């Protein structure tokens, strides 16, 4: 049976700890999985967070969304695959471990600690953080298979990556190439496009104009502009656009007459910046400049430039390129094929060498600035050019520049040999598969995704690092390669292993090989340096592994099949794949969402997921990013501690549309906590009365109950709510779901329905009207708790255990089925009509306030004036609610006669009619009522025609003295403010009842406790109160009311000129 609630007040901390204990003791999570094991499959793929640190509000938001979806699908009957994942390789981990160990370079890693120890430390760090993050996620009430997460460091996961790369190789989609790529000089590795997107930050760099002397021409120069002086030693050409107009300009510079060549369209801008005047001497098209040779400004400092000049026909000449623009610079572009993507391509076209005299740490390997970091060389190069007379102007520019996504070092462009996945060959397939098979939430993200795929180049997947999936590429001395697809294949092909520099030949038998390998290297571990030891033989050639590891984005890109252990475990893959749903932050559109589709189309020719949703970032209340420097970081634990898990969860799904950025607000959190407090109070009220009356819904004969209109209305509303919430979740418009729930709890259930039925709950004994209210409340909770369970799992469980479980029998609210709409209960007309009733009550209350009549004093009559048929039906059907809520003896539809005065609105008449405004005003004073009634008229005054509307008039109305009015959307409410003796007596009785009930509350009396009331008051009050003594006794549970000296617990109430005493009857 229903008991009185354990907690009278809503205390999230205690309640949630109690429920956590209940779930744990009763193994609820496992029971739910068992319950749904035969349901239709639903493959939810968890995007793996990096285990590089504690979770933040953004991570929490992400997991809360996921948990809500998983709980929702489970209640729908699905057997949900809910394995959490963790991204455990890559630079995010390496950088943290380097910091912890005080290491700054790759050389220090190899010499001070060693690769094997460094990898061991990375693994320890990753596993330790996995434990911390798991506990943090559990703290939020996230129900996933925490005992069996997928980890990208497991052998079977790595083997999935090898399988995928072998597939790419077999399809001709994996190849080695030399290209110019983003390079991090601190991490000493190449980075892919998707790692750099979103990592452009404002920084200041040099901005210099330099003149290149034209060979054989005295005082004639090519004028170039650059923000990377450090690339000038690698300059091999100057690019011009074939169709642009270029000019030779005569200038006076440093006391000398010189001739500069630059784009005609940029002459004024460039000369203005430099601060010189010029005269155009000659004009020509860019294509006419092709082949013009110049003298390299740093030829002496970089002797290899002399070799290039002699060996390559197009070295140090103007070449033609379409990438040249007129947006900045001079229209002549300094071109270094070893340090720019476009430079590289045009350099290849003209047969230029790919020269990059820079090492992995971004230091020059030769020439004047050998050993110096390139960005530190910038000022030295500028000063040197000035000394040589080639510097025209030096300044500074603030621009967006790419930085390393993990260590935040400014990147450089550098030509290196790397391994690429040829995504360019499958782009069209990716877009086609995406457009045909993937549903995006919101749908406009699909366009953004497709555009990102179109703009992407080949995927550089090699990284010159340590802690990652080793590239399964073995290479012979003559350059032949072989890609290994599995551990078994590696063992089968292995002929030897190298341990501490010593070669150990392996036996031919697979089993015997395994014994030797395990004895010498230890158990299978597909990381470096374990796999580096293997020497394989293919086509009669011995091969050793290339030392690179795989881009960490490839790790997560294969998650949909690697997490299932494919290809080692084919059964799960065949049962579940592709994923039914994924959801991640906005930055993953061009990262994880992209890497998955690219890897999947390469491996399986199709997409790896069917539905994908995107959410925004969490910012502070002002819209700023949370950071240590701003001191505005709010930790998830802090929110849970202050407001509780349910409040935190609901708030994150209620505050904003999921695809928008969430500006975290403590006020919003408190607003949600108040809503849950309201829900709790409705539960406490319901459970308290139901427990007193031993209410049992199983014994109710529903067909015999006389439900009131408000009962039918709330049952209709809660069934309509099912549609609203379900639609909000299904379309990923989560705020529609949460705000519908919020409004239902606060407005429909608490502020309206409970307000309407409170008196019915006070009735003693077996009252059918009270029973109908009990049953209605119980049915509402039955639906509402199911709807709220995925959002607020704790409070719904606590209420369910007391209010519902005794009669339903199922062990947990989370084991219930998602509610289905009872179409027979839905009455849309009633819902519309009740909405008008609420508006009328609001307007009527405002009218009473105008008249200064308290709600406790009844009024004689209320008139509703309306033209709306729905309002008329509502007033007729729900008249008793209006009478009760507005405390009126009579509520009628009618028309009130009042005096109308129409005057000219000179603010409109004057400006519009100017000199004729007096004529128009005179007409309005005489015929204004006609204009008011018709809305607009065309009139002729003294031979002139005018079009007049209600905008041209001001209407003043005079009501009868006994009425006061207030408008509502749909009509107007009139309150008759005449107070008779009978009405005064009734109102005064209500005033005293309210005060006696307040005193009962202060004494913490039970609703069934009886009292004796004694009242000291004025003679007038006593006479009025005696007319309603029965009412006072009934409402206050008093057995007697005496007018004498107040006794017992006494309170003086000056506003009603009384002292009231109450005594509990034992």
Curated annotation (Swiss-Prot):
Catalytic activity, reaction form: tRNA(Ile) + L-isoleucine + ATP = L-isoleucyl-tRNA(Ile) + AMP + diphosphate
Q: EC number(s) of the enzyme?
A: 6.1.1.5
GO molecular function terms here? Answer: aminoacyl-tRNA deacylase activity; ATP binding; isoleucine-tRNA ligase activity; tRNA binding; zinc ion binding
Spell out the subcellular localization from the entry.
Cytoplasm
- Positions of ATP binding: 628
Q: Keyword check for Aminoacyl-tRNA synthetase, yes or no.
A: yes
Query: InterPro entries recorded for this chain?
Result: aa-tRNA-synth_I_CS (IPR001412), aa-tRNA-synth_Ia (IPR002300), Anticodon_Ile_ABEc (IPR033709), Ile-tRNA-ligase (IPR002301), Ile-tRNA-ligase_type2 (IPR023586), M/V/L/I-tRNA-synth_anticd-bd (IPR013155), Rossmann-like_a/b/a_fold (IPR014729), tRNAsynth_Ia_anticodon-bd (IPR009080)
- Where are the disulfide bridges? none
Short motif 'HIGH' region, span: 49-59
Keyword terms? Aminoacyl-tRNA synthetase, ATP-binding, Cytoplasm, Ligase, Metal-binding, Nucleotide-binding, Protein biosynthesis, Zinc
What the protein does comes down to: Catalyzes the attachment of isoleucine to tRNA(Ile). As IleRS can inadvertently accommodate and process structurally similar amino acids such as valine, to avoid such errors it has two additional distinct tRNA(Ile)-dependent editing activities. One activity is designated as 'pretransfer' editing and involves the hydrolysis of activated Val-AMP. The other activity is designated 'posttransfer' editing and involves deacylation of mischarged Val-tRNA(Ile).
Assembly and partners are described as: Monomer.
- Protein family: Belongs to the class-I aminoacyl-tRNA synthetase family. IleS type 2 subfamily.
Q: What name does this protein carry? A: Isoleucine--tRNA ligase
């Amino acid at each position: 049976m229903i008991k009185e609630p354990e907690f009278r007040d809503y205390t999230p901390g205690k309640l949630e700890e109690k429920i956590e204990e209940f779930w744990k003791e009763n193994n609820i999570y496992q029971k739910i999985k068992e319950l749904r094991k035969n349901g239709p499959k639903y493959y939810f793929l968890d995007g793996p967070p990096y285990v590089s640190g504690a979770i933040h509000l953004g991570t929490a938001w992400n997991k809360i969304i996921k948990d809500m979806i998983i709980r929702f699908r489970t209640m729908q009957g699905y057997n949900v695959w809910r394995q959490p994942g963790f991204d455990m390789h890559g630079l995010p981990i390496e950088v943290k471990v380097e910091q912890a160990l005080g290491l700054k370079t790759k050389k220090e890693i190899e010499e001070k600690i060693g690769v094997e120890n460094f990898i061991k430390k990375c693994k320890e760090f990753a596993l330790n953080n996995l434990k911390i993050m798991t506990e943090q996620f559990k703290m939020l009430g996230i129900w996933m298979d925490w005992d069996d997460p997928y980890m990208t460091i497991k052998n079977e996961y790595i083997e999935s990556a090898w399988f995928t790369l072998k597939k790419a190789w077999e399809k001709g989609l994996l190849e080695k190439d030399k290209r110019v790529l983003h390079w991090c000089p601190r991490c000493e590795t190449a980075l892919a496009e998707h790692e750099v997107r979103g990592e452009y930050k404002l920084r200041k760099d040099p901005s210099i104009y330099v003149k290149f002397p034209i060979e054989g021409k005295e005082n004639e120069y090519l004028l170039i502009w650059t923000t990377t002086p450090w690339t000038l030693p690698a300059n091999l050409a100057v690019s011009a656009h074939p169709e642009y107009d270029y000019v030779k300009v005569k200038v006076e510079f440093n006391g000398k007459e010189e001739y500069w060549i630059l784009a005609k369209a940029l002459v004024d801008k460039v000369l203005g910046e430099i601060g010189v005047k010029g005269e155009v001497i000659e004009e020509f098209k860019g294509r006419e400049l092709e082949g013009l040779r110049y003298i390299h400004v740093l030829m002496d400092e970089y002797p290899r430039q002399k070799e290039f000049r002699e060996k390559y026909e197009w070295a140090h000449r103007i070449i033609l390129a379409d990438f040249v623009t007129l947006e900045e610079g001079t229209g002549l572009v300094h071109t270094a094929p070893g340090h720019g993507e476009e430079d590289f391509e045009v350099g290849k076209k003209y047969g230029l060498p790919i020269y990059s005299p820079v090492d992995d740490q971004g230091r020059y390997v030769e020439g004047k600035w050998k050993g110096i970091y390139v960005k530190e060389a910038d000022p030295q190069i500028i000063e040197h050019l000035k000394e040589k007379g080639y510097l025209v102007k030096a300044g500074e520019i603030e621009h967006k520049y790419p930085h390393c996504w993990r260590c935040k070092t400014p990147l450089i462009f550098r030509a290196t040999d790397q391994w690429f996945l040829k995504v360019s060959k499958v782009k069209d397939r990716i877009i086609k598969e995406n457009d045909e098979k993937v549903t995006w939430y919101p749908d406009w993200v699909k366009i953004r995704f497709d555009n990102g795929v179109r703009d992407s180049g080949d995927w550089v997947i090699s990284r010159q690092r340590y802690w990652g999936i080793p590239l399964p590429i073995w290479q012979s001395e003559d350059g032949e390669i072989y890609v290994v697809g599995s551990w078994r294949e590696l063992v089968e092909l292995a002929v030897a292993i190298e341990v501490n520099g010593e070669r150990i030949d392996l036996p031919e038998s697979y089993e015997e090989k395994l014994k030797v390998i395990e004895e010498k290297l230890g158990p299978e571990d597909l990381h470096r340096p374990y796999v580096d030891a293997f020497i394989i033989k293919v086509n009669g050639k011995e091969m050793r592994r290339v030392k690179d590891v795989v881009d960490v984005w490839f790790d997560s890109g294969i998650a949909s099949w690697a997490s299932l252990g494919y290809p080692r475990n084919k059964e799960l893959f065949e049962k579940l794949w592709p994923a039914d749903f994924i959801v991640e932050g906005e930055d993953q559109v061009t990262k994880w969402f992209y890497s998955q589709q690219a890897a999947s189309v390469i491996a399986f020719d199709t997409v790896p997921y069917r539905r994908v949703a995107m959410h925004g970032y969490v910012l502070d209340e002002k819209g700023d990013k949370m950071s240590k420097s701003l001191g505005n970081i709010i930790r998830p634990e802090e929110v849970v501690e202050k407001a509780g898990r349910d409040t935190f969860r609901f708030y994150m799904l209620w505050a904003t549309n999921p695809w928008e950025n969430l500006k975290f607000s403590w006020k919003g959190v408190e607003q949600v906590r108040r809503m849950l407090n309201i829900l709790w109070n409705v539960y406490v009220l319901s459970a308290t009365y139901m427990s007193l009356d031993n209410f049992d819904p199983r014994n109710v004969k529903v067909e015999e109950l006389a439900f009131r209109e408000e009962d039918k209305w709330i049952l209709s509303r809660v069934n309509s709510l099912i549609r609203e919430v379900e639609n909000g979740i299904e379309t990923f418009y989560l705020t529609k779901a949460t705000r519908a729930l919020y409004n239902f709890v606060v407005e429909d259930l608490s502020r309206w329905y409970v307000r309407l039925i409170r008196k019915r709950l006070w009735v003693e004994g077996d009252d059918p009207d009270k029973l109908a209210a009990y049953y209605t409340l119980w049915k509402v909770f039955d639906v509402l708790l199911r709807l709220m369970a995925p959002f607020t799992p704790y409070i719904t469980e606590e209420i369910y255990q007391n209010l519902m479980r005794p009669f339903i029998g199922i062990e947990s609210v989370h084991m219930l089925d998602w509610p289905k709409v009872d179409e027979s209960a839905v009455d849309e007309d009633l819902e519309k009509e009740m909405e008008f009733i609420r508006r009328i009550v609001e307007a009527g209350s405002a009218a009473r306030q105008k008249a200064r009549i308290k709600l406790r004093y009844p009024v004689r009559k209320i008139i509703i004036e309306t033209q709306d048929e729905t309002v008329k039906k509502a007033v007729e059907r729900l008249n008793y609610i209006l009478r009760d809520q507005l405390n009126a003896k009579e509520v009628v539809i009618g028309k009130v006669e009042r005096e109308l005065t129409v005057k000219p609105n000179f603010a409109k008449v004057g400006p519009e009619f100017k000199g004729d405004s007096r004529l128009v005003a005179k007409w309005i004073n005489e015929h204004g009522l006609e204009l008011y009634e018709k809305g607009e008229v065309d009139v002729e005054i003294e031979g002139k025609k005018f079009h007049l509307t209600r905008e041209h008039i001001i209407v003043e109305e005079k009501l009868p003295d006994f009425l006061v009015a207030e408008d509502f959307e749909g009509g107007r409410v009139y309150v008759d403010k005449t107070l008779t003796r009978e009405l005064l007596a009734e109102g005064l009785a209500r005033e005293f009842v309210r005060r006696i009930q307040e005193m009962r509350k202060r004494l913490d009396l039970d609703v069934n406790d009886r009292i004796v009331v004694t009242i000291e008051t004025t003679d007038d009050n006593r006479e009025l109160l005696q007319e309603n003594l029965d009412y006072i006794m009934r409402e206050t549970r008093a057995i007697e009311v005496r007018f004498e000296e107040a006794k017992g617990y006494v309170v003086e109430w000056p506003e009603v000129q009384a002292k009231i005493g109450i005594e509990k009857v034992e």
